[in-house]
Amino acid sequence: MHPAHLLVLLAVCVSLLGAARIPPLPLSLLNFANLIECANHGTRSALAYADYGCYCGKGGRGTPLDDLDRCCHVHDDCYGEAEKLPACNYLMSSPYFNSYSYKCNEGKVTCTDDNDECKAFICNCDRTAAICFAGATYNDENFMISKKRNDICQ
């Protein structure tokens, strides 16, 4: 084999090893992002909800700041209920990792009938939240507010 070919092969192997260490985005969170953007007709990226108020994004505490933050609080509670279901009691059936089937048609989100009990429950949590997000006012001042004012979500 030509030395240049060996060098290219080595570079590919090294880059693949590096990429293998990058954790993938949990599939159900990717589903949730798609449902959000379906329900709001693509008017706002799902990332805009990743760190909003006291409950949108990782964790959550305190009093929700507005209707949108209340949507996230309800969604957090729904995931908590999903984790209590016997059908969802192992790691890969966690709401954060369990991918489900859905359809999006002109802003209407539908969880499909081929989901098992756990997937159907998680899909309905995400569907309800996505519809709630689409109907709530987005207050720009509440984006990343917990980082701007760490006393607000006590």
Curated annotation (Swiss-Prot):
Cofactor(s) in the UniProt record: Ca(2+)
Protein function: Snake venom phospholipase A2 (PLA2) that has a low specific activity on phospholipid substrates, and is neither neurotoxic, nor myotoxic. Induces endothelial cell migration which is mediated, at least in part, by its hydrolytic products. Shows antimalarial activity, but is not able to potently inhibit HIV-1 replication. Binds in a calcium-independent fashion with very high affinity to a muscle-type (M-type) PLA2 receptor, but is a very poor ligand for neuronal-type (N-type) receptors. PLA2 catalyzes the calcium-dependent hydrolysis of the 2-acyl groups in 3-sn-phosphoglycerides.
Compartments where found: Secreted
A single Gene Ontology CC term: extracellular region
E.C. no: 3.1.1.4
Family under the similarity heading: Belongs to the phospholipase A2 family. Group I subfamily. D49 sub-subfamily.
Gene Ontology biological process terms from the UniProt entry: arachidonate secretion; fatty acid biosynthetic process; lipid catabolic process; phospholipid metabolic process; positive regulation of fibroblast proliferation
Domain of life of the native organism: Eukaryota
Coiled-coil residue windows: none
Disulfide bridge positions per record: C38-C104, C54-C153, C56-C72, C71-C132, C78-C125, C88-C118, C111-C123
InterPro entries, alphabetized: PLipase_A2, PLipase_A2_Asp_AS, PLipase_A2_dom, PLipase_A2_dom_sf, PLipase_A2_His_AS
Binding site for Ca(2+): G57, G59, D76
Keyword Repressor appears in the UniProt entry: no
Identification of the protein by name: Phospholipase A2 OS1
Summary of the tissues where the protein is detected: Expressed by the venom gland.
